[in-house]
């Protein structure tokens, strides 16, 4: 996939990622693109911000960035989220994201 898709865009060095989160799943993984969002499953429950904290920690490993480089831009209380990931060093294949040219 070349260029930008509906589930992400680049703003300089920042990756803006539109996600659909499935908390309290049986495992952690990137399911794939569903419509204009990237579906992500995590085991953390959606209680007291635990799912958001876990999501940031887990994504920091996937994109190989410090946790502080990932921000929830929209959707802090919902399953549909927009994330900002500053200067990702790795793009997981299952996320279907390309580095900008």
Swiss-Prot record:
InterPro entries linked: DUF167 (IPR003746), YggU-like_sf (IPR036591)
Gene3D superfamilies per the UniProt record, alphabetical: YggU-like
GO cellular component, one term: cytoplasm
Homology family: Belongs to the UPF0235 family.
Record NCBIfam families: DUF167 family protein
Protein's UniProt name: UPF0235 protein CJA_0091
């Amino acid at each position: 996939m070349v260029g930008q898709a509906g589930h992400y865009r680049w703003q300089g060095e920042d990756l803006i990622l539109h996600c659909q989160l499935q908390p309290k799943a049986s495992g952690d993984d990137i399911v794939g693109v569903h419509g204009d969002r990237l579906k992500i499953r995590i085991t953390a429950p959606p209680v007291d911000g635990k799912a958001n904290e876990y999501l940031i920690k887990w994504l920091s490993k996937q994109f190989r960035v410090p946790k502080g480089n990932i921000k929830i831009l929209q959707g802090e209380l919902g399953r549909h989220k927009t994330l900002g990931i500053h200067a990702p060093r790795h793009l997981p294949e299952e996320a279907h994201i390309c580095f900008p040219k």
